[in-house]
Amino acid sequence: MKKAVLIAAMFCGVVSLSSCCRIVDCCFEDPCAPSSCNPCEVIRKKERSCGGNACGSYVPSCSNPCGSTECNSQSPQVKGCTSPDGRCKQ
């Protein structure tokens, strides 16, 4: 019985952690994230259940997240920048 509870707890921890990590993707990787996207506030609201989209309705925009036609390769937000062919870099 204890083993089953331990396995369930580990599984839930991994699942909730992966969901909570989306906050980083939404709020920190995209330099055009709106000021209303406050990860601390989101964590407070979703503290008990981080399932689903932890950033609410905010979706990072891949149209031109760097604010120019080219990406700054030194930028910490380079992950969200668009490539020359217009697709979003992963």
Swiss-Prot record:
Identify the keywords attached in UniProt to this record, alphabetized.
Cell outer membrane, Cell shape, Disulfide bond, Lipoprotein, Membrane, Palmitate, Signal
Any S-S bridges, and between which cysteines?
Answer: none
The keyword Ribosomal protein appears for this protein:
no
From the Swiss-Prot or TrEMBL record, state where the protein is found: Cell outer membrane
Q: Identify the stretch annotated as signal peptide in this record.
A: 1-19
Primary location class:
membrane
- Which parts of the sequence are annotated with region: Disordered? 69-90
Report the GO molecular function annotations. Answer: extracellular matrix structural constituent
Q: How does it assemble?
A: Part of a disulfide cross-linked outer membrane complex (COMC) composed of the major outer membrane porin (MOMP), the small cysteine-rich protein (OmcA) and the large cysteine-rich periplasmic protein (OmcB).
Q: What does this protein do?
A: In elementary bodies (EBs, the infectious stage, which is able to survive outside the host cell) provides the structural integrity of the outer envelope through disulfide cross-links with the large cysteine-rich periplasmic protein and the major outer membrane porin. It has been described in publications as the Sarkosyl-insoluble COMC (Chlamydia outer membrane complex), and serves as the functional equivalent of peptidoglycan.
- Protein name (record): Small cysteine-rich outer membrane protein OmcA
Species of origin: Chlamydia pneumoniae (Chlamydophila pneumoniae)
